[in-house]
Amino acid sequence: LATNAEPIIVSMASAVAEIPSAFGIRCEYLPGENRGWVSRSNWDLYIRDRIVALIDETDAKVLVFDGVIPHAGFVAARNARPAVKLVWMRRGLWQKKVHRFALPLQSAAMDYVIEPGDYAFAYDHGPTSKRTEAIRTAPVSLYQASEALNREASRNALGLDQSRPAVLVQLGTGADDANEKMTAALKGLIGWPDLQVVLTKEPIDKSGKSLAPEGLDLKVIKFFPLAKVLAAFDAGVCATGYNGVHELLAAKLPTVLVSNIRGMDDQEARARWCHDFGYALRANQADLNNITETVKELQDPNMRASLSFKCAELPAPIGGEEIANKLLKIAA
């Protein structure tokens, strides 16, 4: 997209600061409502005004919202500049929560709805699955085989020992149940000879207490995009979010999926599909012992080989290119 247009990413996540250096794309950070700095109504006005200012500054033709619920300020910005086309990048696999009742109204407010494909689409029986307004594409992933580093280069980039196995663990922490899942998963890696356990943030609770059991060699890394160096790892343990699944499995990384059921995303449906068809192992997110035992299965080289071989059957995640082309046509 960047070769034919001037995309600008506006995000409420502070991690957006990593994108310009990694991809050469301009980014703007907007503090989210959860900061609590202003009331919700004033925050919506702030979002509206900032986006309108960006539209005017850049002569933007298309405004794309990538998320679950389009913010009122976002829609108000387009209403203030009605010539701009409004697109909702709406992923599928919604849980049947209260947000579903706003779907018809929110969808009608859009000029276009685009649904990035999901490996687990066959298990999508949620509120979006029977709707017809979305343009569906192939799956989207930051992992692209043509851009990924090989194993040696990936390990050099991360500072990992070339001769020792390494496992990537990407699980959230903070809430008590999330902390318990992290500890249970790490326990499943005990006994793997010479293992390097790689995390993207310290496994600690809110008080600073370590969630990791004794006997593991932990390494906390900072690298973006991590999808570029997945060849460094022998296996992975991650939540069953859209990005994690479509990066790790696309990279043929043997993976245990531990779902987070708090959000709108139906991670359990995605995990069941991946497990039922042999692409990954699904741990029972409600059973800590099962999480430990399922992660322990990754220590079996035959299991890892089987999962990796099966993942080679997955379609290439080329949805990003498809979506870019659609947006260019919308802007024309």
PLM feature segments, named:
Residues 3-53:
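Conserved nucleotide-sugar phosphate-binding/catalytic loop shared by glycosyltransferases and other
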Residues 52-70:
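Short N-terminal targeting/anchoring amphipathic segment
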Residues 91, 95-98, 103-173:
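A nucleotide-sugar donor-handling region in carbohydrate enzymes
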Residues 149-235:
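Donor-nucleotide binding loops and adjacent catalytic segments primarily
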Residues 231-244, 253:
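Acidic donor-binding loop of glycosyltransferase active sites
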Residues 244-292:
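Catalytic binding pocket for nucleotide-activated donors in carbohydrate/polymer assembly enzymes
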Residues 281, 286-314:
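Conserved donor-nucleotide binding/catalytic region of nucleotide-linked donor-dependent transferases
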Residues 296-297, 316-332:
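C-terminal alpha-helical cap of glycosyltransferases
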